[in-house]
């Protein structure tokens, strides 16, 4: 038996197919429709129904239909309702973590700080890997003098002009969250961090793409003086005597195509006391 969140997602799929017909490449629906369908199911946090950060969490009917969810945002104006869309070809919305070879694995002596494991938040993961020199060594190898500018988590809104493969996305103003940003000599790196979970073999690309697109559009418009934007995904896994930190650096070969994500490099740091 599935969770109430999964039941609501299945109900949304059935509702959209009944309304628009089978086989469509895109089904658009609103927050109001999500809320209305959530009431008989008893899923109170209807805003969470469209938050799917790994394909492992797709509902059974979404998997059967090959559908994933993207956020279309809200147009300007009082009373406008946020929109979302089911996109057929959910594989284009997720990226599988690459295997990290032994030659790209480093064991590092670890003297834990008193706050390293105080909580499991994304901010704590990023603080830990920065405090122990992992980010500087990974992003700027050989440059021991690199002192990047750090910008902490923030939320903002962007009207992203983009597509997913051949599907043009009719996005309005989308609220995005940037976990952290580093800038060094005109190169910007945006971050997403997660704790390891069983079954989390991939991630929703939009988590990296939306911050990337936010900065890239500002660069294109001449609003910021930078020349390169990359994306870093970090996964922390607690291990006996320390943690394994997997770090992946990505770019988008076509900045307007979310499906064009491409690995630059990856590395595992085995931190042991």
Task: Specify the residue positions occupied by each region the protein language model found.
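Feature captures the catalytic cores and cofactor-binding loops of soluble hydro-lyases/lyases
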Residues: 204-206
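Short, well-ordered amphipathic alpha-helices
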Residues: 208-216
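C-terminal tail/extension regions appended to the core domain(s) of diverse proteins
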Residues: 1-39, 232-273
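Nuclease-adjacent, charged terminal/linker segments that flank catalytic cores
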Residues: 1-119
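Nucleic-acid nuclease catalytic cores
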Residues: 195, 201-202, 216-252
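Conserved catalytic cores of phosphodiester-cleaving nucleases, focusing on short active-site segments
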Residues: 180-182, 186-195, 211
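Active-site metal-binding core of divalent-cation-utilizing nuclease and nuclease-like domains
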Residues: 144-184
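N-terminal, charge-rich interaction modules
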Residues: 97-157
């Amino acid at each position: 038996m599935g969770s109430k969140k999964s039941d609501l997602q299945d109900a949304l799929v059935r509702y959209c197919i009944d309304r628009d017909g089978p086989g469509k490449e895109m089904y658009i629906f609103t927050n109001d429709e999500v809320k209305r369908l959530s009431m008989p199911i008893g899923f109170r946090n209807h805003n969470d129904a469209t938050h799917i950060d790994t394909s492992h969490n797709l509902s059974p009917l979404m998997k059967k239909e090959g559908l994933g969810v993207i956020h279309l945002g809200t147009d300007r104006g009082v009373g406008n309702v946020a929109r979302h869309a089911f996109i057929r070809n959910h594989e284009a919305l997720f990226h599988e973590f690459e295997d990290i070879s032994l030659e790209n694995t480093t064991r590092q002596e670890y003297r834990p700080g008193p706050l390293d494991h105080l909580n499991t938040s994304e901010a704590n993961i990023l603080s830990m890997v920065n405090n122990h020199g992992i980010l500087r060594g990974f992003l700027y190898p050989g440059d021991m003098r690199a002192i990047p500018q750090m910008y902490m988590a923030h939320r903002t809104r962007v009207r992203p002009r983009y597509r997913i493969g051949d599907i043009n996305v009719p996005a309005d103003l989308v609220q995005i969250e940037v976990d952290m940003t580093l800038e060094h000599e005109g190169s910007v790196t945006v971050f997403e961090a997660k704790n390891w979970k069983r079954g989390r073999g991939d991630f929703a690309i939009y988590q990296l793409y939306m911050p990337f697109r936010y900065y890239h559009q500002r660069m294109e418009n001449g609003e910021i003086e930078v020349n390169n934007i990359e994306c870093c995904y970090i996964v922390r896994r607690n291990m006996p005597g320390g943690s394994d930190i997997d770090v992946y650096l990505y770019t988008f070969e076509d900045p307007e195509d979310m499906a064009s994500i491409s690995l630059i490099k990856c590395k595992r740091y085995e931190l042991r006391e």
